[in-house]
C-alpha cells in the first residue's frame, strides 16, 4: 500500500520527468521529433514505474517494477548520450546528472530490497 510520506525516488523521478518534458519540447522546436518522442516516452516512464512500485502487491512485484524503471532509465541515458554526441542538439548536462542520481538510487533500492 502506498505511503504518502516524502519519498526521494518518487520526488527525483517526478522532477526528472518534468525536465524531460521541457527538453523534449525544446528538441521538437528544433525539429528533432524522433529523438524527442523517444526521450519523452522513456524519460517519463521511469517515474511512472516508480509510482507503480509504490502500490506493489508483493516484495517481488516491487522489485520487478523498479527493475523496469531502471531499464527505462538506461534507455533514457542512451537517448541523452545520442543527443550529447550528435551535432546540432541542445545541451542537456543537467538531465544526464539527474539521471545518474536516479540510477544510483534505483540500484540501491533494488539491491537492498532483495535482502
Name each model feature, range by range:
Residues 1-52, 56-115:
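Short, C-terminally biased terminal segments at protein or domain edges
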Amino acid at each position: 500500500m502506498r505511503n504518502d510520506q516524502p519519498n526521494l525516488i518518487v520526488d527525483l523521478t517526478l522532477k526528472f520527468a518534468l525536465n524531460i518534458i521541457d527538453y523534449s519540447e525544446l528538441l521538437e522546436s528544433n525539429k528533432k521529433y524522433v529523438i524527442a518522442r523517444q526521450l519523452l516516452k522513456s524519460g517519463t516512464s521511469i517515474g511512472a514505474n516508480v509510482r507503480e512500485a509504490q502500490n506493489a502487491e508483493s516484495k517481488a512485484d516491487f522489485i520487478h517494477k523498479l527493475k523496469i524503471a531502471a531499464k527505462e532509465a538506461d534507455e533514457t541515458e542512451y537517448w541523452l548520450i545520442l543527443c550529447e554526441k550528435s551535432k546540432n542538439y541542445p545541451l542537456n548536462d543537467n538531465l544526464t546528472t539527474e539521471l545518474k542520481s536516479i540510477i544510483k538510487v534505483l540500484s540501491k533500492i533494488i539491491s537492498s530490497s532483495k535482502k
